[in-house]
């Protein structure tokens, strides 16, 4: 089952409801271990660890229709849940400082078009693995514990960069220093920061 909030007509008196919109397959493993490294009348030291891996895939959606989630994510048959869909960043034109993007069919252009957004296979904000490890030390009724958590294998859209690297569009707000020091200035400059202009805009793309 795949339970999601779906919109309703406002004439119903409700804005949304939870519906079963498809089929989701989850599979993976979890391994945990715990043991006493030291055990005496006064002292006890216990170590523990856990790691988990999960893989999911959308097997079926109602009428096969894709579902947009937030700004850049998509629920689509045959892909992991929340897979990214966005326009691909192609760098900066060294001749004139224009921002460059890939079209849906792979050509390079200096014109941003949201219709050129493509599914980024295998790239989601959801961790591919996560886990924890820790220790617990006790002595005559006193106890000290520490736990650490980790995750990885996922891709996070950097919204801070989206707002602080606006290429001049948000000149009245705080901007990253790279906008000043690394920006394109002269023909032939090789950089990943386009020329600065108040007419620019920070578009949603794989740049961030």
Where are these regions (language model features)?
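Conserved small-residue
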Residues: 19, 24-25, 29, 36-125, ...
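Residues on the lipid-exposed face of transmembrane beta-strands in outer-membrane beta-barrel proteins
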Residues: 31-35, 133-139, 146
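Extracytoplasmic gating/loop element in the C-terminal half of outer-membrane beta-barrel translocons
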Residues: 151-208
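Transmembrane beta-barrel strands of outer-membrane/channel proteins
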Residues: 47-53, 137, 146-150
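Outer-membrane beta-barrel transmembrane strands
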Residues: 123-139, 202-208
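Flexible, solvent-exposed coil segments and beta strand-coil junctions
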Residues: 6-16, 106-117, 192-205
């Amino acid at each position: 089952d795949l339970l999601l909030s779906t919109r309703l007509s406002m004439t119903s008196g409700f804005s949304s409801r939870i519906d079963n919109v498809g089929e989701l397959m989850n599979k993976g493993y979890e391994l945990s271990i715990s043991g006493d490294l030291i055990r005496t009348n006064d002292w006890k030291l216990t170590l523990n660890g856990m790691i988990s891996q999960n893989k999911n895939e959308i097997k079926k959606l109602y009428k096969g229709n894709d579902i947009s989630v937030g700004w850049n994510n998509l629920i689509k048959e045959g892909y992991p849940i929340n897979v990214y869909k966005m326009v691909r960043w192609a760098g900066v034109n060294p001749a004139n400082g224009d921002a460059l993007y890939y079209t849906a069919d792979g050509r390079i252009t200096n014109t941003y078009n949201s219709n050129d957004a493509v599914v980024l296979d295998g790239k989601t904000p959801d961790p591919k693995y996560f886990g924890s490890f820790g220790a617990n030390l006790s002595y005559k009724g006193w106890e000290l514990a520490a736990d650490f958590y980790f995750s990885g294998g996922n891709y996070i859209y950097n919204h801070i960069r989206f707002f602080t690297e606006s290429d001049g569009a948000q000149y009245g707000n705080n901007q990253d220093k790279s906008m000043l020091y690394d920006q394109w200035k002269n023909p032939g400059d090789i950089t990943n920061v386009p020329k600065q202009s108040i007419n620019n805009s920070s578009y949603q793309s794989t740049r961030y």
